From Swiss-Prot:
This protein's encoding gene: azoR
Organism: Mesomycoplasma hyopneumoniae (strain 7448) (Mycoplasma hyopneumoniae)
Record field: catalytic activity: 2 a quinone + NADH + H(+) = 2 a 1,4-benzosemiquinone + NAD(+); N,N-dimethyl-1,4-phenylenediamine + anthranilate + 2 NAD(+) = 2-(4-dimethylaminophenyl)diazenylbenzoate + 2 NADH + 2 H(+)
Role of this protein: Quinone reductase that provides resistance to thiol-specific stress caused by electrophilic quinones.
GO molecular function, one term: FMN binding
A Pfam family that the UniProt record links to this protein: Flavodoxin_2
Keywords: Flavoprotein, FMN, NAD, Oxidoreductase
Needed co-factor(s): FMN
Name recorded for this polypeptide: FMN-dependent NADH:quinone oxidoreductase
Length: 201
């Protein structure tokens, strides 16, 4: 089983809640499936982190080259399952995540459009499950219009992936008393939930 782990928080260097979630999830998963192949990618280490889609690079097609679109699409095609982590940034997923989805959402590569019927068909049907792990500073419900986790789920489903696992949101990271705790300690408080997700993945 090939597991593709993608980290897409902008806080990776100083410490990311969502990245800690991902690391803990993989730790539990490997305890159950030590034979599986794990590939981990921090999107911040690649060109797409600083390559956003614009009118110019869309028209001249350079966006897809600079963002290494084919590289990421091939990674997705070769994966059996995905673990995707990111944090909320200004009520949405990170700009790095947006760049990633722009790079992989490509007609005739990851989805088909029937122009006669308007029907879309996702092509990433090889992906058997996606575990979405996110973090946000506000408690759940403070910003009902900012459901970044559900949006990520819907995009993967649009592209043909199966998302059987419930997404997990580590919320309230910026409010007291949570913001007074070390990241690892706060994440550890939810480790039983993460372990169950890993067992069912």
């Amino acid at each position: 089983m090939n597991i593709l782990v993608i980290k897409s928080s902008v806080n990776e260097k100083k410490g990311s809640y969502s990245s800690h979630l991902s690391d803990l999830f993989i730790k539990f998963y490997l305890e159950i499936h030590p034979e599986d192949q794990i590939e981990v990618y921090d999107l911040n280490q690649f060109g797409l982190a600083n390559t956003n889609l614009t009118m110019k690079n869309f028209e001249d097609k350079t966006f897809y080259q600079k963002a290494e679109s084919d590289f990421w699409i091939n990674k997705l095609r070769n994966a059996d399952k995905i673990v995707f982590s990111t944090s909320m940034t200004n009520f949405n997923y990170s700009a790095t995540t947006k760049n990633f989805f722009d790079a992989i959402t490509v007609p005739n590569k990851t989805f088909l459009l029937d122009k006669n019927t308007g029907k879309y068909t996702g092509l990433l049907k090889n992906i058997q499950n996606v575990q979405i792990l996110t973090a946000q500073g506000a408690p759940l419900g403070w910003y009902p219009f900012g459901n970044h986790s559900a949006l990520i789920k819907q995009i993967f489903e649009f592209l043909g992936a199966k998302v059987r696992s419930d997404f997990f949101v580590l919320d309230g990271t910026k409010v007291a008393p949570n913001n007074q705790k070390p990241i690892a300690d706060f994440v550890a408080q939810r480790q039983n939930q993460i372990k169950i997700l890993a067992e069912n993945f």
